[in-house]
Each structure stands twice: as C-alpha cells, then as structure tokens.
Design a protein with these regions (language model features):
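Alpha-helical transmembrane anchor segments
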Residues: 2-26, 166-236
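Short alpha-helical interface patches
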Residues: 3, 63-64, 123, 195
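Membrane-interface starts of transmembrane alpha-helices
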Residues: 25-31, 118-121
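Juxtamembrane/interface alpha-helical elements of multi-pass membrane proteins
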Residues: 28-111, 126, 226-236
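Inter-domain helical "communication" segments and dimerization helices
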Residues: 44-49, 90, 101-110, 114-123, ...
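Short, structured helix-loop boundary elements
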Residues: 54, 58, 118-121, 139
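Hydrophobic alpha-helical segments characteristic of transmembrane helices
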Residues: 64-85, 121-159, 166, 223-224
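Flexible domain-boundary/linker segments
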Residues: 98-99, 125, 129, 158-162, ...
C-alpha cells in the first residue's frame, strides 16, 4: 500500500494547491489538503485494502481449483496436483502451505476450507471425494464446476476492466473541471477576484471541493464492488 499512500498524498497536495489558487486563501488550502488526506487514511485506504484482499483471495481459489483438477487429470496424482495448484502469489495462502507441511493432501484440502470459504471450493472438495471413491475421468466429474470457475473468473476480469475505464473517465471529468476553474482564475483574473470577494461565491468554492470528495467516495465504493458475493458466487 506504500505506493498507493504516496499517490493519494500527492493527489491531496495537488488538490490543496488548486484550492489555494482558486480561493487565494492559505487556510482553505490547508483545510482541503487535511480533509483529503484524512479521508484517505480513515476510509479510502481500508476500502481499497479490503477490495484487494478479497480479489486476491477469490482469484487464488479459482486458480487453485482449476490448476488442481487439470493437473490431476494429466498426472493422476493428488500430491502433484496440489503442488502445481499451490504455485500462486497469494501470501496468506503461502503461509497456510507452511502450516500444513506435516499433513497429507486430503487433510490439506480439508484445512483450506477455513481459508477458501466459498461454495465453489466446497463443491471442489466434494468432487475430489467422489473421484477418490468412484474413480473415473476427473474432468468429466468436475465439468460443471470448471465451467462455473471459468465464468466467475471471466466476469471478474470484465468487471475489473470496466472499472478501470470508468476510473479514467472519472479522472478526466474532474481534471477538466479543475482546468476550467483554473482558467477562470488566471485568464479572467480581474473578474474572478471581484467574484471571490462575494461570500456566497467563496462558500460555493468550498462546497465544490467537498462535492469532489463526496463524488470520489461514491465512485470508490462502486469501483471496489466485486461481482461476487461472500460465498464466491456471481451476484444476481
């Protein structure tokens, strides 16, 4: 989160600097900067961190299920399947792998239920139990599960791509708004400063920066809304 912290603080300082230019008031500059910085560290940072952790966890689960089943169908070995499926970058998952060193594969799969509390993982463990009891082609047994895993993964990727496009649109919209305000401040300075002496106009400037923060919060909540619920199932 260090990179995100730096970006957010820089953005807060830039917005605070804009507030100084358009209000010609150092106290407004300091106030706006502090409000934006506090918002990030009190609310936004937690929202972003939760979103990132949830995204990593569900994608880690989907990768594990898909890789395990495909490897099992090729090598017909639970140990090899687990080893290949465990090669992901989820740090919390890797910590669990360390804790499960003395367990056999079946015990490991059962232990992971505590971490992967998703319906797809519970279905996965049932598929493995059925395969061990009855044998057969594991890919045929798990066909519907694999299709669902692919569908969830594709939906999450599409949602992430769509959110990034909306983020670009959001940034451009507010950037243009700030540029218009700065244009009035510097290109029409005489007219602008005469308006700035008006208390209602000065108050509107402060409201403007507060509205910007509110719109940022609303966008952030929408941006970090995952297309899956707590069970790992697609919404709707």
């Amino acid at each position: 989160m260090k990179k995100m912290d730096l970006v957010s603080i820089t953005m807060s300082l830039v917005i605070g600097l804009i507030a100084f230019f358009v209000s010609n008031n150092i106290f407004v500059c300091i106030g706006v900067t502090l409000i934006y910085v506090l918002y990030y560290f009190v609310l936004a940072r937690k929202i972003i961190k939760t979103y990132n952790l949830k995204t990593i966890k569900i994608k880690s689960c989907l990768y594990f299920i898909n890789t395990f089943l495909i490897t099992l169908s090729i090598k017909d070995s639970l140990e090899d399947a687990f080893e290949h499926a465990s090669n992901n970058t989820d740090k919390e998952f890797q910590q669990l792998i360390y804790e499960m060193q003395e367990m056999n594969v079946n015990e490991k799969l059962d232990y992971l239920k505590k971490y992967y509390s998703y319906s797809s993982y519970r279905m996965f463990t049932k598929v493995i139990s059925l395969y061990l009891d009855q044998g057969g082609n594991v890919l045929k047994i798990s066909e519907s599960l694999l299709n669902e895993v692919v569908r969830i993964d594709e939906t999450m990727n599409e949602s992430e791509s769509s959110s990034k496009k909306k983020l670009v649109e959001f940034v451009i919209l507010w950037l243009l708004t700030f540029l218009v305000l700065l244009f009035m401040r510097f290109a029409l300075s005489e007219f602008y400063f005469s308006m700035l002496k008006s208390i209602p106009f000065f108050a509107l400037l402060i409201v403007f920066f507060l509205l910007c923060l509110v719109s940022l919060h609303i966008f952030l909540k929408r941006f970090t809304k995952l297309p899956v619920n707590e069970e790992g199932e697609l919404n709707g």
